[in-house]
Amino acid sequence: MGILLAVPEIIAASVAGGAEALSIAGSGAAIATGEGLAALGGLTESAALLGETVEISEAAATVLTKVPELVTVTQGVTAAVQGGAGLVGGIYTALAADRPGDLPASTPTGSPSGLHPPAGYNPQGGGLNIQSIHKPLHAPYPGMALAPIPEYNLETGIPGVPDWVFNFIASHLPELPSLQDVFNRIAYGIWTSYYNTGRTVVNRAVSEELQRLLGDLEYGFRTALATIGESDPVNAIVEQVRSFVSGGRQRELLQIAAGQPVDISEGVSRGTATISNAVEAVRDATQRLSQATYNFVYDASTLPRDGFNALSDGVHRLGQWISMPGATGGTPHYAAPDWILYVLEELNSDISKIPTQGIKRKLQQNGLHSKASLHSKTRKVTKKSTHKSAKPSKTSQKRRGRRAGRRTTVRRNRV
């Protein structure tokens, strides 16, 4: 699924959670990107990264308990490291104290947070199925609301950080350096410092670079999430797609007015070429927007409908195939969140075909009857002028005579 099917769900869940939930998700995003540095600095505890404890009020705990999608999204944002420690573990630990029934008793306890299986667990042995995004995803325990998101083979080469995090940073925070650039800079600093002066300068360079990275990410994500909290994500998606469709309509109208046939295959081939060149589209900002919009329209139009799309208590895994228990065992179903269905309804209410024959006929009529309309206007003006110069009628003459007689009578009485 494209970035528009992943990021707006995070935005919608964070907005629904309130201001405090947004602040929690913001620090979780900063911690998530910092956990990718575990191979360099040995950072395994999320609390040690910020040096503070997570305090959750009763209102925020209620929001997070009633909206399990927000907990799942926060877990995806943090992208917990292999040890299983992370901000989501701290959030769930605080929530489990108030709601101990949320976590099944048979949950594996191989990690401090209880969200990851113990060491030696075979992912392919009937438990967590690390496969492609469109294949069934089986949870290691019955609690689907707490099933961890698998760690896929990422194109960027940084384990534990999903692809949409880099796309989100590149699209919303263009002024920040990319994580790959920061990693290359750290590696180059380690090599040159060790070659020149030794271990002291190495530690100093790594520490300064890590602190700078964490500070930039924390500030950037706080700013981005604060802006997101004041927006309406669903209507923003609808307006984006409508502007995309209206641009195509305007282009077709110009072609029809010029007498050129509308080439539909050109748009299809252009979209296919954009998908095949996804790497180049990410590098170019303009092509990235077109690619994201095309991916959203294509994915939304090909959603299967089987009665399980509007799951209120289930988990949709950001638009993935999930396995739900049933009478015949685990059956995979495609679960789409409610905001996708709302967007589809809004889009279908405004999309219609262009009346090509009606437009041509209207243009021809305007060209033929222009002289006739001008002639009718001159006739109206002539009638008005002749009406003013005509002689007064007999009735008006009688009225004037009566008024003159009354005036003479009044004058005689005064005398």
UniProtKB/Swiss-Prot annotation:
A lipid is attached at residue 2 (N-myristoyl glycine). Residues 358-409 are annotated as: DNA-binding. Keywords: Capsid protein, DNA-binding, Host endoplasmic reticulum, Host membrane, Host nucleus, Late protein, Lipoprotein, Membrane, Myristate, Viral penetration into host nucleus, Virion, Virus entry into host cell. GO terms for molecular function: DNA binding. GO terms for cellular component: host cell; host cell endoplasmic reticulum membrane; host cell nucleus; membrane; viral capsid. GO terms for biological process: symbiont entry into host cell; viral penetration into host nucleus. Residues 102-121, 365-415 are annotated as: Disordered. Residues 318-353 are annotated as: D1. Residues 372-415 have a biased composition (Basic residues). Belongs to the polyomaviruses capsid protein VP2 family. This is Minor capsid protein VP2. It comes from WU polyomavirus (WUPyV).
